[in-house]
Amino acid sequence: MKFNRFTKYLIVFALILLSTTTLNYTTSLRAQEPPQVQITQPEPNPIVPDSIFMSQLPSWARLVDIRTVNPNIRLDIRYATTNNFLKRKLYPISKCALRSSVAQKLALVQTDLEKIGLGLKVYDCYRPFSVTEQMWEVMPDPRCVANPARGSRHNRGAAIDLTLVDRTGKELEMPTPYDDFTEKAHGDYQGGSAESRKNRQVLKDAMKKHGFIGITTEWWHFDSEDWQKFAILDISLGTIP
């Protein structure tokens, strides 16, 4: 079929008009589409290697020996002995290490308790991640040991296991001994003696005042309320000054 020049121009014009209309319509549809939301999965807390530990952590986040902050806090670091539920020595030395800011808060708890003739005795503080792995290998039970897949708040240097003592260092009566994983160790257990429940509450109130939160299953365990800001560490206790 042959077209004269005018007809050809008319066809070209029609095609241009059709293309413009289609483009405008498509643009209009895109403008009406809701904006795409990009969801970013949070990165897991990194394990900080020994080589950069001291040099890169800010002073408030470094691990410190609690005895350098308040020497009046008594120690009975059970995992440095065989006197624990695993019957194994897991720490090379008896030391309570905590993040500096956490240690400062615990020192304030000790100071307050001394005003009423009491004090703290610590069973466990910072726990290297590799020790948690060892514990899980022996007893892979989340009721007793933190699953290494998530890590422990002890691994962050932001958790403490402890009890109360009198002026002479004698432990006050509590509902259970340390590392008793029965319901009697729960924070709301109403059995046992009235004295043990009162002492448990004194400890809880003293810790809460300075920013520590207890857990439901262990009367002796307290987390710093800001524990999430600290990364999991695997620093040997022997390297902490």
Residue ranges and their predicted role:
Residues 27-123, 137-217, 223-241:
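Extracytoplasmic cell-surface/polysaccharide-interacting catalytic and binding patches
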Residues 2-11:
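Bacterial N-terminal signal peptides that target proteins for export
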Residues 128:
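Segments that shape or occlude catalytic/ligand-binding pockets
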Residues 131:
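Short, well-ordered surface patches within globular domains
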Residues 2, 22-23, 122, 219:
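Intrinsically disordered, low-complexity peptide-like regions
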Residues 11-22:
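Bacterial N-terminal signal peptides
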